[in-house]
Each structure stands twice: as C-alpha cells, then as structure tokens.
C-alpha cells in the first residue's frame, strides 16, 4: 500500500513542505523565526476573529465595544490582550527574521527576499490599521498623522488623503474601511507567506556558513519539527508573561481615553515597532523628504542583493561586516528610543545622526567593508 502522505495530492504538498523536506543539518535557532511567524499569524487570525464577533466599527460605539469585550465577554480580556501583544511578538519575530536574512546573506534568494519585503509592508499596514480600531486618542491621532503624510505627494496628495479618509477628516467612513481592510489583510499575508515558502523550497534553505549544503541534508521531520516546537513554546511563554502580568507594558496610556478630535495628545507616537521609522520620518524637516526617508528605510532592504560585494555569502567569517551589522542593530535601537521621545534638544540631533548613520551603514560602509574583506583574503 502506498503511503498516503506521498500519494494524496494535498498530503503530498504538506509532506514535501514540512515532513520530508531536505534541510541543512546545521541551521541554528535563527532559522526558527519563520515557523514562529506562521504561529503568530494563526494566533492573530484566531484571536482577531473572536474579537471581530464582538467589535463594532462605528465611531460612537467602537471604544465601548472594546471595553465590553474586556469586561463582559467570557475571556474577552485575554483574547484582546493576546491579540494586542501578539502583534508585538509578531514584529519581534519579523525583525529577528529579517536580521537573520541580512546577517547570513539569505537575501540572495531574490524571489523569497522580495516577497518577504512585501510581507513586511503588508504586516506593517495591517498593524497600523488595527491600532486605529479601538478608537482611543492615540488611535485617532495616529491615523490622522500617518494618513496625512500622503498629502506630501505632489499634485494628487490632498485628493488621495481625502479619498482614503472618505471625508474631510478621520471619521466613521475611515474607521469602517480600516476594520474591513484589517480583517482581510491577514488572509492576504497568509497567501503571500505560502508563496514565500514556495520560492524558498525551490532553492532550499540557506545555512549559517553560507556554503551550499546539498551534500549534507537531513529530513525536516523529526529534527526541525521538534526544534520548532521548542521555539513555539518559548515564544508562547514570553507572550503569556506579557499578557498575564503586564498587558499594557507596550501600549500607550492615551489609548484608554476615547478619541476626541478637539483635543490633541501631548506626544503623538505609534506603537513601539514603528518608532525607528517614525524617528527617521521626524529627522527630516521637510514633509515630502520625511515621507521618502520613511518608505526608503524599509525599501532599502530591496537593494541588499545589489549591495552585496563580498565573495562570501554569510557574515559568519567576516568580522568587519559583523561589527557593522551589530552597529546597525544598535543604531536601530537608538532610533526606536528616539521615536518615543518628544521633539526637543538633544533628541532631535541624536535622531538625525542616527538616521544618517542608518543609511550610510547600509549604502556605504557595509559594501566597503565587504570589499576590504575580499582584499584581505587576496580575492
């Protein structure tokens, strides 16, 4: 009798992707984040579905419906906080996943990398729209500030913003459409993630050395299934510590004040995972320039394959590049800190220096370091 896993059309796909998949024997825990992101996405879709059953997307009742979920719905509070903090876990895993790709040269899988960038943009858009839904002060003003950035686009900007708003300000129409988009986007993300995986399985996984590992492959199951389960358990542990002990640690207290168009909060800032980009945006005193820098801060990832000057794929054996990589990480942490600070001295200048440093590191210093390393190795 033939094995159903290998003969059935659907089972065959699952088998080739998660069971009999040939995987490098030496991939480290940095390769766990793909599966963690998958779990995050499933968790977000499930908790989001249950929240959507009780949420109302009308400006008069949105805030109250979230309160109702937390107070009156059975286990509504845990579903709400798992969804809110699940987004933070999602972005932690995303940043680690992208960082791994940069460090080990995974960006040389062009299709996989480019779909990953689209996934990153889609996830950021989804998180932004989700933050608007509770209709607190930061929801309303965050939506106003970020959507208003599109007015910097020459000629069509103002019309574009009013079209997105569905009026002359962020109002009922905006909230309703954001809810609709926030609901549909995760399914688009799931579909894109499957394409991401499809392209990855065309080439096989990279590994820490960056050397071709075709001669030394092991089956995905049981080796990496058990490794992924360990990663998932650790992630759920961290998530539940957040949810059960400090659910509001990463949130903004201003979002517990219902949205009021007549009262601006003293410091408008997005969720922590957007602060690095927000700091870059604020560093440029010109609206259009800021918006361009904001988009380029993520889109610069698409240039990584072209900026790869090294004869080696991974940074594992490239100490100069390693130093620059960790300086880049420190720079991004600095930008994240600055994004949450008020616009005043000395934060302005620190933010500007960190923003310049970010682009110089990626566009100039890393390619130069790669070339130096090639020469040191007489290549």
Swiss-Prot record:
Subcellular location: Mitochondrion inner membrane
InterPro entries cross-referenced by the UniProt entry: Cyt_b/b6_C, Cyt_b/b6_C_sf, Cyt_b/b6_N, Cytb/b6-like_sf, Cytochrome_b, Cytochrome_b_C_euk/bac, Cytochrome_b_N_euk/bac, Di-haem_cyt_TM
Keyword annotations of the record: Electron transport, Heme, Iron, Membrane, Metal-binding, Mitochondrion, Mitochondrion inner membrane, Respiratory chain, Transmembrane, Transmembrane helix, Transport, Ubiquinone
UniProt binding sites for heme b b566: 97, 196
Subunit structure: The cytochrome bc1 complex contains 11 subunits: 3 respiratory subunits (MT-CYB, CYC1 and UQCRFS1), 2 core proteins (UQCRC1 and UQCRC2) and 6 low-molecular weight proteins (UQCRH/QCR6, UQCRB/QCR7, UQCRQ/QCR8, UQCR10/QCR9, UQCR11/QCR10 and a cleavage product of UQCRFS1). This cytochrome bc1 complex then forms a dimer.
Designated name of the protein: Cytochrome b
Misc: Heme 1 (or BL or b562) is low-potential and absorbs at about 562 nm, and heme 2 (or BH or b566) is high-potential and absorbs at about 566 nm.
Entry's Gene Ontology BP terms: mitochondrial electron transport, ubiquinol to cytochrome c
Binding site for a ubiquinone: 201
Family annotation (PANTHER family): CYTOCHROME B
Record's GO cellular component terms: mitochondrial inner membrane; respiratory chain complex III
Binding residue positions for heme b b562: 83, 182
């Amino acid at each position: 009798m033939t094995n159903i896993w290998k003969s059935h059309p659907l089972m065959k796909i699952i088998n080739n992707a998660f069971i009999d998949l040939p995987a490098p024997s030496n991939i480290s825990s940095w390769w766990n984040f793909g599966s963690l992101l998958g779990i995050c996405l499933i968790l977000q879709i499930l908790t989001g579905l249950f929240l959507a059953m009780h949420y109302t997307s009308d400006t008069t009742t949105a805030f109250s419906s979230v309160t109702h979920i937390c107070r009156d719905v059975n286990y509504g509070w845990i579903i709400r906080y798992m969804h809110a903090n699940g987004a933070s876990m999602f972005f932690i895993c995303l940043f680690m996943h992208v960082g791994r790709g940069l460090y080990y040269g995974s960006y040389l899988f062009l299709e996989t990398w480019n779909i990953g960038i689209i996934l990153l943009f889609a996830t950021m858009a989804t998180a932004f729209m989700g933050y608007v839904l509770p209709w607190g002060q930061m929801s309303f003003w965050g939506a106003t500030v970020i959507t208003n950035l599109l007015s910097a686009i020459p000629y069509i900007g103002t019309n574009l913003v009013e079209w997105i708003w569905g009026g002359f300000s962020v109002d009922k129409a905006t909230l309703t459409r954001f809810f609709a988009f926030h609901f549909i986007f995760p399914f688009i993300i799931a579909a894109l993630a499957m394409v991401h995986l499809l392209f990855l399985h065309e080439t096989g996984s990279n590994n820490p050395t960056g050397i071709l590992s075709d001669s030394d492959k092991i089956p995905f199951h049981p080796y990496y299934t058990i490794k992924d389960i360990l990663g998932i358990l650790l992630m759920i542990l961290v998530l539940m510590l957040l949810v059960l002990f400090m659910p509001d640690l990463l949130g903004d207290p201003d979002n517990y004040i219902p949205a009021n168009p007549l009262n601006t909060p003293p410091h408008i800032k997005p969720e922590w995972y957007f602060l690095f980009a927000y700091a870059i945006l604020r560093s440029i005193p010109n609206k259009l320039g800021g918006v361009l820098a904001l988009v380029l801060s993520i889109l610069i990832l698409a240039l990584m394959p072209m900026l790869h000057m090294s004869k080696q794929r991974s940074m594992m054996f490239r100490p100069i590049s390693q130093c620059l990589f960790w300086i880049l990480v420190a720079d991004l942490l600095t930008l994240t800190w600055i994004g949450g600070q008020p616009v005043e001295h000395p934060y302005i200048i620190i933010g500007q220096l960190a923003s310049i440093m970010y682009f110089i590191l990626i566009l100039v210093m890393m390619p130069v370091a790669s070339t130096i390393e090639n020469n040191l190795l007489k290549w």
